[in-house]
Structures are given as structure tokens and as C-alpha cells.
């Protein structure tokens, strides 16, 4: 009985092929194709998306606003499919702008296939494209239906489906004369076998065919045989045009992403010469901004491979690292002798695509057939090795570093202006908040270096007169509430108490060991008001004995919330060598343009009294990095300043002022003469309870580029991404 036309047409349509992650990774470029899970937090990088377009990426970038930053998103859906024209696998990723982290909703979609997945690949030579047979690489017989050579079976007919479901017939041949396996024709016409497959797929030299067996083992007829195609890069106008993403669609998707409101979809082709542009948040933040992964010239790196290509190892040496570029910021000289595909890898790669250490061994999983058919150790690249966590918490309790927690509202939504408690003039000739600091010498820190004891001698005794009471058993409290007891001695010179000397002996060695103080660290003694309890704090030198840092996740969370216009919180530590990254808006927008050769003066915090006694710091602008948003000025500081050796040459434009636009005088000459020296400071008076902001300014580094300027509640400001001197 004849079937109806519709039923016959439906029967002729091949059933679709389910593309799981194993098939996807086998068809993807070996160094690409990493897919995020549904529900994970990612960064969408428009530069990588634009790179897939057929037109010149630079021309398309000119149609978009500048600059274009990575956009934080959440993966809403992930669909794997095959291009109908080229046969290439691609992924459609649905993204939701902003942070919508739901750990319970995270899942691998689509999931991995059945155990026992095997595949081999072959890049076509000119002879493979023009001849009637394909010479198979070693190990192909473990994927294709096997031949019984002992029983003189030298040929076998089998069929295989492409990723669109279409069936092709091949002949598996054993060439006993040359001792090699081949894929041949049926000998009927030019449209069957290997020759027919080349014509149907319009294969060209340097294209790659991938044969896969999904499910089953090596037995006869076990599992499903599939064949995929990986196209080589081609010039525009060539004989085999490559399908791509429409330019207008890419532009609209970038605009939607930058608005941060409407969900959008992107299409990703894991082709040669391109990289994934939807990157996990942890990978992007950890490898682009983490201080544990500095890419200095000469560093040896290993290219990350997708999970099924881990048998290959490609290494290279870093030539340059441009942290200002959001895409392909790393230039690497690849070792072409180590891997046959090294010459096909672009020298410009992304920081999250390489690892500084060799890839460790792990469990055995899907096998990639190589020269030797053995169980290949595989590393799940999705589980990247993380840098060691810092020993300090957000509150910096182990290191005793002072910090500020600043709650921020994006935009101008918070208009109530509430300044912090201001300091008032001293009463009765004495200031209510007094302090002095001292940088530790080798003798001061001898207890931490293995010595039996140490003494803390105050070089200018007048500093301690209003801070340390004349008590033999001096009890001092640190900023975390811990109490310390020191043996305090002092000596008078005649009747002038300003010439007396103070020394801390007993208990000082235990304090040095407990705080792990090193030479160059600074100890600050403070007193809340005359007659109050003394306090002690620590200011660490750069890269001192205590590892300090803000976890990467805190920085990433703040970035995600800020990008989605949500309130967020940042932590600022006034360490030496860092600068405040929450800056008043009028300072950033009102900073004058500077040119190389301009004489500038470093701006100091006018509310910090200890700065008034220090001489101004002058310098000459050496270079201006216009594209940079952080530390865009390079300044040669005058060597006659005592702070010059500790100053960073790279500063921000709002941290300096041209000499021609001099600041108004900060107090009279008599006030400047009466100010205390750098080792004996008297802070501004506060209200009955001293402001924590004043304590933060006291704990700030005296040799930093500027004292910490804490924004008032409700003030408008800009938060700057500190890529050069990131605290996180």
C-alpha cells in the first residue's frame, strides 16, 4: 500500500542527532569550546563576539560606543546545534544581564554523553581532498568498525551519520602493502564513499573531519557512529564561504547587553582562531585581576585545552601583557616544536586561557585516540586550580590593618548629604586625639628575627608626652580589642619634659612575634583623648611579612551589583602604594588635562594635620596614557623629597595639580612651625567619641600617594577600577 505524500516525505527526513557536550567538545577547536553551565555567573565580552563577524571587527566596533566593557550576566539557557550550511557545531547562549546567582539552579545543559565516548580527527591535506581515499591516523580502527585481519577481512562497509542526521556509506580498508587503514569509495559512482562525502560537505584543504563513536565499545555494531566537520579559516570571497553571525544582530545584542535590562542571545562558533567570549566570572576575575597570577614577560604558560583535548600540551613564553585591553591582552610566543598545532594558535590570547603551571593528572574519562591507544589521563578544565586564599579576612583582623567599608548607590539616587563627624579645634592648647608613629628598625623587630629580645625606643620623646602616660606597667589595647602590657621606662632631662626619653622593653618582643612585625612596618600609638586609654595599630609595608588582600569574590560581587544598578559595598585599605578608588565626582571630572613635561604637585589630604609639616612633593609628567582609567599619569618625582623613593610613578590625574594652579595655604607659618614632626603627630580633635574616619587617616601610610579621603554620606563620586594597584 502506497504511503501518502506527506507520510513519505516525513519518513525521508532523517531523525535529528542529539548533540551532547562530548560531541560538542570533539568538534570544537582543541583550545576552545568551554561551555558555561545554566545558572552560572559569567562575563559577556563583546570584543570576542564581534571577532566572529564576517566584516572587519574594527569597522563594526566603530558603530558602537567607546569604551566597551565586559558585561556581567547569568546564563539562562544553552542550546547546542549544527549549522545547516557548513555542518559546524555552534552554541546559542541565552544571557540575563546582572547577577542572578542561584546555586540550586546550576546544571550542565546539555549533559555529557554515555561512558565510552571515543573519537579521532584528521586535518585534510591536498591529497586527502583530491583522492578517492582518506588515510586514517593511528588509532582510528578503535573508533570505526574493526576489521578481522587474521581472517583476511581487509574491507568492511559501514554507514555513519553526520550531525544533521544524514547518512553516508564508507568502506573501511586495510592496505596490507603499506600497513595502514584507509577510508575508501564503494566503486559505484563519484557520489558515494569518501569522494561523495568530500563533495557533499564541500571540504577543502586544512578542514578537519571528526569521527566519533558514542556508546558501546569496540565490538561489532556497538554504539552510534557520527561524523563532524571543523572548518579552517578562509579569506572572504573564497570558494567556500564560512557562515557567520550577522553584523546587525551582533550590534543589537551588544546594545542590549550594555543597557543591562533586556535578556539577549549570542551565537558562538568554536572555530579556529576564535575563543569563547562568554567566560565564567570566577575565571575572568581570578585570572585577569588576581595578584596571584601576574603575567610578566618571560613567564612560561600552558594553553588550556577543552576537556576532550587534554592529551595535548601547548606551552609558550609571555612576551607582553596589556591589562588595559579587555580582549586578547596577552601576547605569547608558542613553542612550535612541542605541539603540531602550535603554529595554528594566535599569539594574542586571553589571560583566562592559559595556566602558569603544568596541567595535573586526574581520573580517566573520555578517551581521545592518539598514536598510542591507552587510557589517557584527563583533567576537568572546568575545575581550575585556584590561588591560595589570603590569611586575612575582610576585616583584616590577623594583620591589624585599618580599613573602610563604603556602601554605594549607583547613579544619583541617594541625594541626602550627611557629612562624617568633623574634627574641631583643640581645646586648651591640647588636642583630644593624639598619636605618633615609628617605622621599625632592625633592632625594633629583632624578636621576629630570632633574637632573644627587642626594645622599642621612641626617637623623639616629645611625641609620647600626650600619648603614653607615665606608668611603669603600660597597658595598651589594639584595634581588635586585644590588650597588651609593656614595661615602660622614661627619663627626664632636667625639668624639660620635652627632652625626656621613652622606651618599651618587657612585653615588646611578644608583641612583635604575635603581630609578625618586620623591618619597615610601622607601629602607631594613639590616645582617644587626654586621660583616655592608649591604642596601638600596625601599618604594614608593601609585601611585608603578613599576606593581605581582599578576596576576589568581593570585588566581583561589587562589580556585578554596580553593573546592574544595585547598591553594593566596597572595602578600602589605605596601604602604602595604593590610592583611593572611590573618588568624588567633581575631582575626577574637574581634573585639568596634563601634557608631558608639566610640573605637578602631589595633592595631600587637607584634613590630615600630619601632612602639613611635610614638604610638598613635586614632579614632572613623563607620559600620559589617555586610554587608561586608572593611573593614567607617569610622573618623575623630584629626588629631594623624602617621600620620593616610596612613591609610585603611576598616579591618577586627580591626585596631582599643576604647579601653576597652586593650592591655597593650609594655615599660617606659625601653625606650620608649631606642627609636629613626621615621627610625632597630633591629630585633629574630634567629638566626644573620636571619629573612626580619623583613626583610618591615622593608620594610613604616610608615604602613600595621598592620605585617604573618605567620602561623605550622600556625596556624588565615581568608583574607578584599579587594575594597576588592585587591592583585591
Curated annotation (Swiss-Prot):
GO terms for molecular function: DNA binding. Residues 665-728 are annotated as: Disordered. Residues 119-233 bind DNA. One of its GO terms (cellular component) is nucleus. GO terms for biological process: auxin-activated signaling pathway; regulation of DNA-templated transcription. Disulfide bonds: none annotated. It comes from the Eukaryota. Residues 665-689, 700-712 have a biased composition (Low complexity). The keyword Transit peptide does not apply. SMART domains: B3 (SM01019). It is found in: Nucleus. Keywords: Auxin signaling pathway, DNA-binding, Nucleus, Transcription, Transcription regulation. Belongs to the ARF family. Auxin response factors (ARFs) are transcriptional factors that bind specifically to the DNA sequence 5'-TGTCTC-3' found in the auxin-responsive promoter elements (AuxREs). Homo and heterodimers. This is Putative auxin response factor 20. The lineage of its organism: Eukaryota, Viridiplantae, Streptophyta, Embryophyta, Tracheophyta.
Amino acid at each position: 500500500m502506497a504511503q501518502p505524500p506527506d507520510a513519505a516525505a516525513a519518513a525521508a527526513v532523517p531523525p535529528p542527532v542529539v548533540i551532547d557536550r562530548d560531541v560538542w567538545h570533539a568538534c570544537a577547536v582543541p583550545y576552545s569550546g568551554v561551555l558555561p553551565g545554566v545558572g552560572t555567573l559569567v562575563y559577556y565580552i563583546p570584543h570576542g563576539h564581534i571577532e566572529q563577524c564576517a566584516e572587519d571587527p574594527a569597522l563594526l566596533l566603530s558603530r558602537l560606543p567607546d569604551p566597551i566593557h565586559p558585561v556581567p550576566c547569568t546564563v539562562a539557557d544553552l542550546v547546542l546545534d549544527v549549522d545547516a550550511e557548513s555542518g559546524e557545531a555552534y552554541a546559542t547562549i541565552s544571557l540575563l544581564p546582572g547577577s542572578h546567582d542561584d546555586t540550586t539552579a546550576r546544571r550542565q545543559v546539555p549533559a555529557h554523553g554515555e561512558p565510552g565516548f571515543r573519537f579521532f580527527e584528521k586535518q585534510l591535506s591536498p591529497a586527502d581532498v583530491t583522492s578517492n581515499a582518506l588515510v586514517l591516523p593511528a588509532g582510528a580502527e578503535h573508533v570505526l568498525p574493526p576489521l578481522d585481519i587474521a581472517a583476511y577481512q581487509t574491507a568492511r562497509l559501514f554507514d555513519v551519520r553526520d550531525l544533521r542526521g544524514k547518512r553516508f556509506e564508507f568502506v573501511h580498508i586495510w592496505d596490507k602493502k603499506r600497513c595502514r587503514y584507509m577510508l575508501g569509495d564503494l566503486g559505484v559512482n563519484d557520489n558515494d564513499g569518501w569522494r561523495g562525502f568530500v563533495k557533499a560537505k564541500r571540504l577543502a584543504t586544512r578542514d578537519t573531519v571528526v569521527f566519533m563513536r558514542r556508546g558501546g565499545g569496540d565490538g561489532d555494531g556497538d554504539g552510534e557512529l557520527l561524523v563532524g566537520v571543523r572548518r579552517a579559516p578562509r579569506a572572504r570571497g573564497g570558494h567556500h564561504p564560512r557562515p557567520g553571525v550577522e553584523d546587525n544582530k551582533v550590534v543589537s545584542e551588544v546594545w542590549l547587553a550594555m543597557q543591562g535590562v533586556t535578556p539577549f542571545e549570542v551565537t558562538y562558533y568554536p572555530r579556529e582562531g576564535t575563543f569563547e567570549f562568554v567566560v565564567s566570572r570566577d575565571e575572568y576575575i581570578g585570572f585577569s585581576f588576581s595578584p596571584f597570577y601576574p603575567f610578566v614577560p618571560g613567564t612560561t604558560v600552558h594553553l588550556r585545552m577543552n576537556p576532550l583535548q587534554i592529551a595535548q600540551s601547548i606551552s609558550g613564553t609571555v612576551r607582553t601583557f596589556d591589562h588595559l585591553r579587555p580582549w586578547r591582552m596577552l601576547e605569547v610566543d608558542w613553542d612550535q616544536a612541542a605541539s603540531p598545532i602550535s603554529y595554528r594558535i594566535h599569539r594574542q590570547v586571553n589571560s583566562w586561557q592559559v595556566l602558569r603551571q603544568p596541567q595535573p593528572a586526574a581520573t580517566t574519562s573520555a578517551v581521545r585516540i592518539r598514536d598510542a591507544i591507552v587510557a589517557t589521563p584527563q583533567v576537568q578544565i572546568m575545575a581550575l586550580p585556584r590561588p591560595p586564599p589570603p590569611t586575612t579576612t575582610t576585616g583584616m583582623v590577623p594583620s591589624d590593618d585599618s580599613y573602610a567599608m563604603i556602601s554605594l548607590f549607583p547613579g544619583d539616587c541617594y541625594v541626602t548629604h550627611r557629612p562624617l563627624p568633623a574634627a574641631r579645634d583643640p581645646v586648651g592648647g591640647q588636642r583630644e586625639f593624639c598619636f605618633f608613629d615609628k617605622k621599625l628598625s632592625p633592632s625594633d623587630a629583632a624578636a621576629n628575627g630570632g633574637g632573644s629580645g627587642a626594645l622599642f625606643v621612641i626617637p623623639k620623646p616629645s611625641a609620647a608626652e600626650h600619648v603614653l602616660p607615665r606608668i611603669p606597667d603600660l597597658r595598651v589595647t589594639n584595634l581588635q580589642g586585644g590588650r597588651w602590657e609593656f614595661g615602660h621606662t622614661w627619663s627626664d632631662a632636667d625639668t624639660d619634659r620635652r627632652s625626656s626619653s621613652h622606651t618599651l622593653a618587657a612585653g615588646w618582643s611578644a608583641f612583635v612575634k604575635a603581630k609578625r612585625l618586620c623591618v619597615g612596618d610601622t607601629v602607631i600609638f594613639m590616645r582617644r583623648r587626654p586621660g583616655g586609654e592608649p591604642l596601638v595599630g600596625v601599618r604594614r609595608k608593601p609585601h611585608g611579612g603578613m599576606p593581605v588582600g581582599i578576596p576576589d569574590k568581593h570585588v566581583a560581587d561589587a562589580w556585578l551589583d554596580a553593573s546592574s544598578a544595585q547598591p553594593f559595598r566596597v572595602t578600602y585599605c589605605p596601604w602604602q602604594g595604593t590610592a583611593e578608588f572611590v573618588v568624588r565626582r567633581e575631582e575626577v571630572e574637574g581634573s585639568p588635562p596634563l601634557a608631558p613635561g608639566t610640573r605637578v604637585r602631589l595633592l595631600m589630604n587637607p584634613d590630615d594635620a600630619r601632612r602639613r609639616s611635610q614638604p610638598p612633593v613635586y614632579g614632572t609628567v613623563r607620559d600620559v596614557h589617555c586610554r587608561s582609567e586608572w593611573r593614567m599619569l607617569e610622573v618623575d618625582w623630584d629626588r629631594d623629597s623624602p617621600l620620593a623613593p616610596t612613591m609610585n610613578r603611576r598616579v591618577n590625574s586627580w591626585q596631582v595639580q599643576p604647579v601653576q594652579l597652586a593650592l591655597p595655604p593650609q594655615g599660617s607659618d606659625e601653625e606650620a612651625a608649631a606642627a609636629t614632626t613626621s615621627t610625632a603627630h597630633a591629630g585633629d580633635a574630634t567629638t566626644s567619641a573620636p571619629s573612626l574616619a580619623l583613626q583610618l587617616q591615622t593608620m594610613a601610610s604616610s608615604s602613600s600617594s595621598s592620605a585617604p579621603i573618605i567620602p561623605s554620606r550622600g556625596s556624588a563620586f565615581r568608583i574607578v577600577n584599579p587594575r594597576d594597584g588592585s587591592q583585591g
